[in-house]
């Protein structure tokens, strides 16, 4: 028999039936304007002893459309199995795909559709349709409408109706907000039995059907709550919520949230808890009256007659959503709930700092104290996570308000804000107390002065990490202290500079003349770099913060972004040996000491030497010895003397000063003694005098280091 189909897809199904042999056409009908194709699918490969009773040939009805996924109905007595939808009228449809139709549209055709139906039946017969790595099926079908609730614990909630494109949402708002929304009584029932069948049950339409869906008597539990609800009249909530009007209480809506444990097999702990909410009555009064209760003359609820019509009360299903909170945020970001307990102080909420903070806030990670003295200005918005509403506000305070809006202030992870810089004398006690109580300090100031002050004055026993970008915004740098603070930020800063001068690809890392003036002051300049980079690097920072506690090691890390790829440079932080000399603290790289020992040994029996590269910190009287320049080619090396040459030396010093923008420079000389003694000879003292005469012209002390057989000595001469 020839059939003329209205839809192109139906025509293609008929063509593919004969071409594939996957089934036989029974009929094509127009039912209430819908084109219904009835097909006998099969014969199929069904096991002799199937887990579920699937026939070799199954009759299905397909409602065909051209621009959506066709609906496939199976026989009415088909067993309830996973991936089967049971409609309110009892009819059953196959759940063929676990993704939206638009996601498979490009591969979807009539042949693929028919083969998918066969696959569904054959795998269902073997109980293999639901894969082991797939989430368990919900207990009831999904619904479009939803409730968005907090975890306040009250049996009363005020809900505001929000119309979306395809659904209605009821969002919890403040109970005290009597001008908006409606008050609902929210009751809950916990189903003690764990369900293991992994099937979607038919959505109940009445209170009685809801009760029949479980072995436990949830309506009896519901009834026991009536007196408790009525007793609110004896509490302060009666005035807050209902303005002491009994009519308002009686006219409250009633919601019932049911929690069901779902397991894959008998005896296992629940893999997930499924929660479904139902509006079980339009008003509290109509509900308790259906159960036979009335208000007595003593103004109490009393049962005066047997329950009659309560099982026929229509119910409305809702999906349950909880307000965003830190634990939910942690879960959604694949963290563990215990992770968010760390007390962390963040200094600096600028472009990079605000986006790091935003990442951690949205992950529910940490308990934070923010420190920043600056206000938000219009030019900041190019790379700051805040918006126009925050202009003029202190950045730290505005970020706290930002977090409050995400978590509704009930579960905020921003515990304190200090609206001053870390040098503020009036806030020192508060700043030091916050840091001493923290497990980590995150420095995002991009300020050497702040980093040094934190390292030497504030940190105490608290580990610190410093994040900053280079002037062009093409690289992110992380300086991470060791857990015991034996390696601190200041020496990691020196290792960062050394990395720049030793890696030729990084020689232009700090060069930039790209600044834009945002005010008429001489300091009113802001660096120019893409928001894209700040966003990428902030993600690396927040990820690094979450991994810090898993390792005690210190590191210097740099991520360079170029041509849509990232290159990482990583150096393990090293301990700098400390020596006191003439009122100065000498900090010298341990690996550099080893390097000088090696050069001495290689040149024996002669002496050798070179130039010391480092920096001075006059605030803390520290001399950093970071690197050396090897003995120039025209140097004279003898068993009892060393005369350092000068070939190419000045050019090398100028280059490293340019690379590090003056943060490393010439600080003195080193040479070796063939013997174990590192005492200076009279010629060494003359050398030290000449060194100091040269360096004092730049305002620096002169430094001389002598390396012996197994020890070394440092000599410092200043004014």
Question: What residue ranges belong to the model's regions?
Answer:
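Glycine/serine-rich phosphate-binding loop and adjoining beta1-alpha1 elements at the start
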Residues: 142, 152-342
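Compact alpha/beta protein-protein interaction domains typified by the UBC
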Residues: 28-98, 107-108, 117
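Glycine-rich adenosine-cofactor-binding loop
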Residues: 335-375
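Conserved beta-strand-loop surface patch within small alpha/beta domains used
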Residues: 567-666, 674-719
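Adenosine-phosphate binding glycine-rich loop
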Residues: 469-565
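Domain-scale recognition of soluble eukaryotic interaction modules
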Residues: 3, 75-169
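Phosphate-binding loop/pocket of nucleotide- and phosphate-handling active sites
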Residues: 304-323, 548-602
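Glycine-rich phosphate-binding loop and adjoining beta1-alpha1-beta2 segment
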Residues: 375-411
């Amino acid at each position: 028999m020839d059939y003329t189909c209205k839809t192109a897809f139906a025509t293609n199904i008929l063509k593919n039936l004969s071409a594939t042999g996957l089934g036989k056409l029974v009929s094509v009908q127009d039912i209430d304007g819908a084109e219904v194709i009835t097909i006998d699918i099969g014969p199929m490969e069904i096991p002799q002893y199937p887990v579920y009773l699937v026939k070799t040939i199954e009759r299905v009805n397909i409602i065909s459309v051209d621009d959506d996924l066709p609906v496939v109905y199976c026989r009415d007595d088909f067993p309830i199995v996973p991936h089967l939808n049971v409609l309110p009228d009892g009819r059953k449809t196959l759940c063929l795909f676990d993704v939206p139709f638009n996601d498979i549209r490009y591969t979807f055709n009539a042949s693929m559709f028919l083969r998918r139906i066969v696959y569904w039946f054959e795998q269902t017969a073997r109980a293999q349709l639901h894969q082991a790595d797939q989430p368990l099926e919900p207990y009831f079908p999904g619904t479009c409408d939803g409730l968005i609730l907090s975890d306040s614990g009250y049996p009363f909630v005020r809900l505001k109706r929000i119309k979306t494109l395809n659904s209605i949402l009821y969002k919890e708002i403040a109970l005290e907000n009597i001008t908006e929304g409606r008050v609902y009584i929210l009751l809950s029932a916990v189903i003690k039995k764990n369900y293991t069948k992994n099937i979607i049950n038919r959505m109940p339409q009445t209170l009685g059907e809801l009760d029949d869906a479980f072995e436990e008597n949830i309506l009896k539990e519901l009834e026991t709550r009536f007196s408790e609800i009525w007793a609110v009249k004896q509490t302060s909530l009666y005035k807050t919520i209902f303005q002491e009007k009994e009519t308002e209480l009686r006219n409250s809506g009633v919601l019932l949230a049911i929690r069901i444990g779902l397991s894959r097999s008998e005896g296992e702990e629940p893999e997930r808890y499924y929660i479904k909410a139902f509006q079980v009555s339009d008003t509290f009064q109509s509900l308790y009256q259906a159960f036979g209760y009335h208000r007595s003359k003593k103004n109490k609820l009393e049962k005066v007659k047997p329950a009659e019509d309560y099982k026929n009360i229509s119910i409305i299903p809702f999906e349950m959503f909880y307000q965003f909170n830190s634990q939910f945020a942690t879960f959604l970001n694949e963290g563990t709930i215990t992770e968010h307990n760390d007390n962390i102080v963040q200094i600096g909420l600028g472009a990079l700092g605000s986006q790091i903070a935003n990442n951690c806030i949205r992950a529910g990670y940490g308990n934070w104290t923010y420190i920043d003295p600056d206000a938000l200005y219009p030019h900041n918005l190019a790379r700051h996570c805040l918006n126009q509403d925050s202009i003029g506000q202190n950045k730290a305070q505005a970020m706290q308000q930002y977090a409050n809006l995400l978590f509704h202030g009930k579960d905020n992870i921003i515990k304190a804000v200090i609206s001053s810089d870390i040098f503020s004398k009036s806030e020192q006690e508060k700043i030091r107390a916050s840091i001493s109580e923290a497990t980590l300090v995150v420095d995002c100031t991009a300020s050497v002065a702040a980093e040094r002050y934190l390292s030497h004055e504030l940190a105490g026993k608290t580990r610190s990490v410093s994040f900053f970008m280079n002037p062009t915004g093409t690289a992110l740098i992380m300086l991470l202290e060791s857990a015991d603070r034996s390696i601190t930020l200041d020496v990691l800063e020196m290792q960062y500079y050394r990395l720049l001068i030793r890696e030729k690809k990084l020689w232009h890392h700090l060069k930039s003349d790209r600044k834009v003036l945002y005010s008429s002051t001489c300091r009113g300049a802001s660096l120019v770099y893409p928001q894209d980079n700040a966003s990428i690097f902030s993600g690396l920072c927040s990820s690094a913060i979450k991994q810090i506690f898993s390792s005690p090691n210190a590191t210097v890390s740099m991520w360079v972004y170029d041509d849509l790829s990232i290159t990482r440079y990583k150096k393990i932080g090293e301990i700098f040996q400390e020596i006191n000399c003439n009122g100065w603290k000498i900090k010298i790289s341990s690996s550099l000491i080893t390097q000088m020992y090696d050069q001495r040994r290689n040149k024996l029996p002669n002496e050798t030497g070179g130039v010391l590269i480092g920096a001075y910190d006059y605030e803390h009287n520290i001399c950093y010895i970071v690197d050396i320049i090897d003995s120039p080619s025209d140097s004279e090396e003898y068993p009892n003397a060393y005369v350092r040459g000068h070939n190419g030396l000045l050019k090398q010093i100028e280059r490293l000063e340019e690379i590090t923008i003056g943060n490393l420079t010439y600080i003195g000389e080193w040479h070796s003694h063939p013997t174990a003694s590192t005492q200076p000879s009279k010629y060494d003292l003359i050398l030290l005098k000449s060194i100091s005469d040269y360096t004092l012209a730049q305002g620096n002390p002169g430094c001389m280091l002598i390396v012996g057989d197994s020890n070394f000595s440092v000599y410092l001469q200043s004014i």
